[in-house]
Amino acid sequence: MLNILNQVKMKAIIFFCFLGLSFSAVGFAQSSDWMNLDTVKAGKYDTGKMWTFEYPPMDYFESTYHFRPDDDWFEHVRMSALRFANYCSASFVSEDGLVMTNHHCARQSVTQVTKEGEDLHSNGFIAQTLEDERPVPGLYVDQMVLFKDVTDEVVDAINKASNDEERAQFENDKIDEIEKRESEETGLKISITPLYNGGKYSLYGYKTYTDVRLVFAPEEKIAFFGGDPDNFTYPRYNLDCSFFRVYDENGKPLKTDNFFKWSENGASVGEPVFVVGNPGNTDRLNTVAQLEYARDIQYPRTLELLNSLIDINKQLLSDDPSKKLQLEDMIFMLENSKKSINGVLEGLRDPILMQRKKDFEKNFRSAVDADPELKAKYGQLWDKIADSRKKLSEISNKSFALSKNRFTTPQYFFVADEVIAIAENLKLPENERDDLYVGDELDNTLSSLYSPDYDAKKDQMLLEAKINVMIKYLGADDPLVKEFAGGKSGKEAVEYILDKSKITNVDDIKDLLAEGPDAVINSDDPFIKLMLNSKSKAKEYADKVKEITDVESSYSQQLGIALFDVYGTSIPPDATFTLRLADGVVEGFPYNGTYAQPFTTFYGLYDRYYGQGEKSPWDLPKRWENPPAGLDLSTPFNFVSTNDIIGGNSGSPVINKNAEIVGIAFDGNIQGLPGNFIFRTEENRTVSVHSNGMREVIEKVYKLKRLSDELKAGKITD
């Protein structure tokens, strides 16, 4: 699935997945044994087809599809598209604020609106009336209503810097200044996004809608039919759609002039189609040195972390089935991210694909070297970036081993930090202490060290995982590691540490503090000693990593300017979770020695259901086990097209030339695995739910005629 993130854990996943994408881990590497790699050349669209609304390729559209959309078309499409919270895409599909996105984008929302005694993931959610539509706390959608180029203003500020370190600071300061100014002037949510690694800067203004209510979500079994084994494959049979509604400030369905009408016939073979959405992140413009670092260090490390987190959450679910809703959401997200990262890694290890990247870099570098002015400004940037990656390779794993974050680090570490802070404050007169460490506030601080829902078993498993990371990247004989774990590893190390610790519960912490601040600072508690003894080293590593990456960011920004000078808008910028338009056609592809047809049907769904013995994850919800009378099994269900998508595109509308809905994108095929760094037109496909299939089942399986009628009419009809 294309969505890698749920709204609660977005920042945490970014931390360790480096914005993973959403493609599978199944092997696909091409054999290069028979090929002379020197003959491998970059493809015309290796950098993809995620076109910005600022720089649409009009001539290309006209020559390829005999279609030259005008400004009104682009504005209507832009205003009809939405960003779904901070992790998916969506769109308005009726004048009454009806919103369409994927079911897997709605998982967290479904969990949130589930009432006691309900199991909406298993049974689905159907709002038969407007009054039945359920508000989702905290959910919002963004509509991009403004964009403009602010490159000159930002670059002028950057150019005033006297060194590479200052460039990043000057860039951030100017962006903050412009965003604040424009936000005050427009009343919109303003965000400035670097494109082409800083070759261009675009300002986007969003209107945010915060009253969003769930209208329809199918059962998990049909939305994610085939489960993890079928994920990121094709043929597929998934009803991966859901519908919400935006309400206005008066609590009425929002009236909007901009929405996508529903196509009467849906997508057809060979038809040009456009995916309108917010692709999250790609690294297609990265240098070869940056990609090699990702291949050799970043992604292998991330996969190890994901594997440990998946194991932990599966064990927690096995131990406590009452936490099924929350833990299954987390496991789903982690496994999706694992497949994504593993898929990118497989691609990076493919010598043919890497040779295509090397050829692109060679051509780009040759173009720069051929222009004396460009060569003088930018000719050394590739070597400088390679040098920075070499330096980063020497310390990043060590920095990672000593780093802390709230998602993957055991709570014990943060408790130790807080106990140390309390002790240091207790040395001071009350009037000089931080407010958190005085009187009743101190009691509150102590009580909050371990929350009522604190899970000690989970923390112990996170501790074991952290010990393994420290041993791997710092070494078992490292003084910090040796002292902390007592020369032990795994569960033995956990037992050793917890037996010696005095901060695993609030009562013991109070007893320790009662001995005085010096007793805390000089304690032999393993957590306290580790936090004190590792502080300077962790800061040293973190500062060095920041220094290297800040300087490299400056190099990448300059390289982005060179890229734009050489190629202009003939190639699109990397994905930035901002609105893009990706063109393609409905088309199958060769696979497994045969050919994947562009469409699947409900006949195929039932063939898969019975062919797999009606067993999970190919079992069906009760209402689907026997097709209802009138359901046309020949109706197209899912389909593939040649559009370019990535994580963040989940929920993107697929439209035709008339800006009508013909589908909703939810996945990519296995050949799209390396899409993070290279787009392959030959077999890369977008997998979508067909518009005809959605309406057919909404009306005939779910008996939700009011929704089916609204999609057909483009407005509420009753």
Language model region names:
Residues 14-24:
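Bacterial N-terminal signal peptides
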Residues 1-3, 22:
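Short intrinsically disordered, low-complexity coil segments enriched in acidic
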Residues 2, 9, 13, 28-718:
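Terminal presequence/propeptide segments associated with secretion/organelle targeting
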